[in-house]
Amino acid sequence: MAVGMLTVPQAVAYALLAGLPAQAGLYACLAPMVIHALLSSSRQLIVGPVAIAALMVASTVGQHAAAYSDAYLGITTVLSLQVGVILILLRALQVGGIVNLLSHPVISGFVNGAAVVIIISQLAPLTGIATTSRVDDGAVDRIVLLVRFVTEVNPTAIALGVGSLLLMAAVRRWGPALVRSGAKVGGDGDVRHALGRTGPVLVTVLGTAVVAGFGLDVGVVGSVPAGLPELTLPLLDAQLWWDLAPNAVLIALVAFVESYSIGKTLAARQRRRIDSHQELLALGAANIGASLSGAYPVAGSFSRSSVNYASGARTPASALVCAVIIVLTLLWLTPLFANLPHAVLAAVVIVAVYELADFRSVVRDWRFYRGDVLTHFATFAGVLLAGVEAGLLIGVGISVVLFMRGSARPHIAVVGRLGDTPHFRNVKRYEVRTWSHLVAARVDESFYFANADTLESRLAELVDNPEGMPEDGDSAGGQAVEHLLIIMSAVNFIDTTGLEMLQRLTHRLARRDVAVHFCEIKGPVRDQLEHVAVDEWLTGRVFQTTDDAFNTLTEAAGKWIWRDVPANTRD
């Protein structure tokens, strides 16, 4: 029941954000919600209209038609169908892992940027300014228009909007405490949490009553047709489908990442797991249902799913109860929307997206890995300045470049034996035993095109000047390097460029009477090497373990060297 009450104002608000009539938001809560409940492996996830998807719809469809028009709605149903088909194709091809391209910094920067854009877009209705902005306008364009029309603010609308913001904040902050100190409604924290999120329902009811009772001169939703949605067949326009496809892919990926993350988080609280493949199917089918019922793309809702969980829902039946409330609203309560003020709906949207934004993680990332901070702010700035789709692509591009940059300069550690144990550690970090005729190098990366040249150069340099070992060999009887042992415990694959690099390195060192050996090879990599007859070109041997290699290559080596390193170092 609580979820259904929260869904109604959010559905109407997000529909207007997407550039659609209010009923389209309610339609997005019927067929999609029921279909997802029947197919999903998550017990608490509630799908329907969400702010991020609404913004992406406005950005995409606004390029092809005027908001709130029949043509706009028709294009939106095509977009919903494409999103659904893409998700089901990902399930059929079992390539759902493609969503991993959207790393946490990309998603965080995208959500934070989108939240700022959405909040800026709601400042006009919040203040009663009737601007001429398009739904696909960016943040900068909207700010310029707000400044241009600042003299047209409506004090009454501002009072309603700001009052709604304050009331929702108060309910969120003190509502649970009031329940706890008063009568024990349900008695536990989950119920208090759910009641703390009923602010949107309260401000919607009060705002509508105040406007209707006092006849206030503010922008309102107006007439909303009653009745259930009719079957809608998407437009069959090949050029339109082609134009929408790139953005449909992005919306599908963002919708799935958002939905799956919420579902996984809620399932973990019950020590359960959800099936990512099943979630692809369920969300895809839900979006197809949205298309056929005149709605726009749907995704998992964080706020409604949280309320659903906090209310004690443990089966998908709760989503069906929510759908019943939407049906009742469409059949008998739509006249009430006539006096629902835009300022109140803007406040509902602002509070919802404010809860999604998370800038605190940036501080943590700065201390841990600053490349993630760069990705976050590049995505954030891209969304603000270039649009949501461009910002997302910028973030993905930078994260891939940073990954390639890191793997192109892999960490290589020269290791030695830790005392008389079968364990080996970095000579720069531990007190270990080494032999000057043997260089044992652990490469902490796979061998592929991006790092092949770097690896060849650095491994050859280690033979000339082994790290942490005497350059002149005086402490080891003047022995020259005779063996290069490549420890491949961190190598997960070798591509053809990496293979050619190993062959070149082997032949290059053979001319200097240095044998190349491999050890700690993983099964898949060993299979790869067997296909290219490694025994025919490798000048050394392939050992099972590093200990085996050291025992064999040092048994007649003579004097070893202690590497004295401070004990407080770390591997």
Could you describe each region identified by the protein language model?
Residues 1-421, 435, 497, 501, ...:
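Transmembrane helical cores of multi-pass ion-transport proteins
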Residues 126, 527-536, 561-571:
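Short secondary-structure transition/capping segments
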Residues 261, 265, 524-528, 552:
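Phosphate- and divalent-cation-binding pockets in alpha/beta enzyme and binding domains
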Residues 355-532, 536-537, 547:
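The feature marks cytosolic C-terminal regulatory regions of anion transporters and related permeases
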Residues 460, 547-558:
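A short, amphipathic alpha-helical segment
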Residues 468-480, 553-571:
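Intrinsically disordered or compositionally simple regulatory linkers and C-terminal tails
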Residues 540-541:
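Peripheral, non-AAA+ core regions of ATP-driven protein-machinery
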